[in-house]
Amino acid sequence: LCEMPEGIGTQFQGEWALYSCSMLAAALFNMSKLYPETKTENLENIDNLIEMVLSFELRKYDAERWGEDPLETLDGDRSHISYISHLAWMISEYKMAGGNDKYNNLFDDLCGTMNRRLLRSKSLNLPTYPNECIYVPDMLVAIVALNNYSKLNKGKYISTVRKWVRKAKSEWLDKETGLLVSFLSEDGIPFKAAPVKGSYSALNCLYLTQIDSVFAREQYHRLKSHFLQSGLLFGIREYHDYSCWLGFDIDAGPVLFNLSPSGTAFAVGSATYFNDVRVRNNFLRTAEIAGHSVMWNNTRHYLLAEIALVGECIMLAMRTTTP
C-alpha cells in the first residue's frame, strides 16, 4: 500500500495494490510455464503475494465501501466481487503451478461464494461497489477464477462459466463495435450512452483468453479494428469514436494523443497470447517511449514504475501471457 500514490485516495490505493499483487502473481505463474526451472521460487513469491492480499490492511478499502469485511462475510449476500475474485484467481494460479493444499479450504469458500452470489443475482453479474454499475472487466476476473477452479475440481462451476459466456455473446455486445460493453446495469442491460472504452475492452480480451480462446480472438480482432492507432505512438485508443488529445481517466491513466496507457498495456497480453508479433513489437516500442526502461543491478524495469508500480506488474504479466 505504501508504494501506491497518495493522491489517488484510499480506495484506489487499495485497488491498485490488489491489482499489483494479482498481476504480479499472473506474471509469476506465466513464467513458471515458460521457464519451469523457476517454478519453486515463483511459487514462494505467489504465496507471499496471496498473504499480502489476505492482510486486513489491503482488504480494508473493500470493507470500507461495503461496510463489512469481505472474508468474514462469505456466508452473506453482498458482492465484494472484485476483491474476492482477484484473491481466488491468485490462489488458482498457486494451485495450477503446483502449490500445496494450504489454501484449499479458502479457495473452496471463495469460489462457492462467488458462484452462489452470481446465480442469485438479477443478471449473473455483481457490482464492484454498492450503488454502482457492473464493471464488465471486474466480472471477468470472477469468471476466470471459476473457470480455473473447474479445471482443478472436475468441472465444478463450469456451468456458471458457460452460462455467463453465452449471455455475453448474445446480450452484452456493443452494437457498433461488436465488443463486449464496458458497463452494465444491475439488471444486465447495457447503457445506451455509456462509452465502450479501450482500456476495458483490451482487459476484457485478455481475460477471455483464459476462458474461451475463440471468443477472445474474435474480440481481439474487433479491438484492433476499432481502437488501434498506428504511427509513431502505436497503441490502443481510449475512445474509438472521438479524439482526446489530453485527458485523464483513473482506469486508463493519462490519455495523450488519443492513446490509452492501460489499454495499450493490456493489449500486449492478447498480442502475446495470439503471437501477433508485429503488433506486439509496436506496442512494446510505445511502452518503452512512455515508460523508459532502465538497468539497475542486472535488472531492468520501467522508470515510470517509480510513480505507478501497478503498470510494471501489468506489463510483466502481459509480456509473459501464454496459452
PLM-predicted stretches and their roles:
Residues 1-5, 11, 25, 32, ...:
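A conserved position within tetratricopeptide repeats
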Residues 2-17, 59-64, 75, 216-323:
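CBM-like carbohydrate-recognition segments
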Residues 16-32, 77-95, 134-150, 190-211, ...:
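Well-ordered alpha-helical segments within folded domains of soluble proteins
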Residues 20-22, 27-140, 181, 320:
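Extended ligand-binding groove/face enriched in aromatic
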Residues 31-47, 94-109, 150-162, 208-225, ...:
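Structural helix-adjacent loops and short alpha-helical linkers that scaffold large soluble proteins
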Residues 35, 57, 98, 118-121, ...:
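Alpha-helical junction/boundary sensor with strong preference for TPR arrays
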Residues 82, 121-124, 132-262:
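Extended ligand-binding clefts on enzyme/binding-domain cores
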